[in-house]
Amino acid sequence: MKDPRDIIKRPIITENTMNLTAQKKYTFEVDVKANKTEVKEAVEKIFGVKVEKVNIMNYKGKFKRVGRYSGYTNRRRKAIVTLTPDSKDIELFEV
């Protein structure tokens, strides 16, 4: 099994994701090869909370050009983690 800190890259903190924290939903950028089970176990191990479900979205890389050079940006994977109602909040997202 992979190290949990390799699976969870960083939290995604935007206005929309901060509104979701009221519903106990937290958003993270995760490794593109990680599946829902690995994300669930990593969040439970790192933050000490109970996860109810995990939703995952994939983003393909955007096409970019710089002068005569062209290529794609890195693809990304975003996970929205829903905690159980009796679980404590993740302090990382506190204002």
From Swiss-Prot:
Similarity comment: Belongs to the universal ribosomal protein uL23 family.
Protein's UniProt name: Large ribosomal subunit protein uL23
GN (gene name): rplW
Pfam family, one: Ribosomal_L23
Gene3D superfamilies recorded: 3.30.70.330
Origin superkingdom: Bacteria
GO MF assignments: rRNA binding; structural constituent of ribosome
InterPro entries recorded: Nucleotide-bd_a/b_plait_sf, Ribosomal_uL23-like, Ribosomal_uL23/eL15/eS24_sf, Ribosomal_uL23_CS
GO CC term, one of those recorded: ribosome
SUPFAM superfamilies documented for this protein: Ribosomal proteins S24e, L23 and L15e
Record's keyword terms, sorted: Ribonucleoprotein, Ribosomal protein, RNA-binding, rRNA-binding
Keyword Signal assigned: no
Job of this protein: One of the early assembly proteins it binds 23S rRNA. One of the proteins that surrounds the polypeptide exit tunnel on the outside of the ribosome. Forms the main docking site for trigger factor binding to the ribosome.
Any Gene Ontology biological process: translation
Quaternary assembly: Part of the 50S ribosomal subunit. Contacts protein L29, and trigger factor when it is bound to the ribosome.
